[in-house]
Amino acid sequence: MDLSGKRIVITGAAGGLGRAVTAAVIAQGGTPLLVDLAFPADFAPGEEKFAFDLTDTAATAREVARMGHIDGLMNLAGGFHMGPSHDIGDDGWDAMFRINVQTLRSMVAAVVPKMLAQGRGTIVNVGALGAVQGQAQLGAYGASKSVVMRLTESLSAELRERGINVNAVLPSIIDTPANRKDMPDADPAKWVAPADLARVICFLASDAARAIHGALVPVRGLS
């Protein structure tokens, strides 16, 4: 895999997966353009950072216009919720679609015109293995990630003949501090290490994956 000379937008960059993907992009010679709602003061010194609300379509368009040339988009921003599907409430339901779907939609709306103008680009989204089939306690989360997966397929069908590859990874549980805290009785050795998932994401953003379109790639670890 080689991302040399490629400018890659990474949303959710300040999170556990975002940090791993940023490190992988840099290791493969790419230039990360880091996006999140806010960044710690000492986060990724020397890298280009853009702090704004991805659910705000107008703000997203303004910030993407400032980024200049974009070769790849990695939509990592997202959130997770567990609870009875009948009892999540409007706020919880809306939050899952705002964080998992609206963030992706606003970035795609801003970035795809740039890629179409240059005749090339890659987009990698993050779905979920838990959304392939309905799971107990994951109603709103699974529904929102199902939208991500269907959007990935639709975007691929629309853009593949225009030089743009659109694919998604479908991880099981990612080994992050937050997940370890939320699931203290689980065995994290069976989860997906962020660095391993980052390598798959970077592969899909590389020229080595040029022939891959609309794939939903399971990354399950040992779970």
In which residue ranges do the predicted regions lie?
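Conserved NAD(P)H cofactor-binding loop of Rossmann-fold oxidoreductase domains
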Residues: 76-82
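Active-site-adjacent segment of SDR/Rossmann-fold oxidoreductases
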Residues: 133, 154-164, 210
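Substrate-binding pocket helix/loop in short-chain dehydrogenase/reductase
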Residues: 84-85, 92-97
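Active-site loop immediately N-terminal to the catalytic Tyr-X3-Lys motif
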Residues: 86, 133-139, 161-162, 190
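C-terminal helical subdomain
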Residues: 161, 168, 176, 186-223
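Active-site helix of classical SDR
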Residues: 108, 144
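Residue(s) in the substrate-gating loop at a strand-loop-helix junction
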Residues: 128
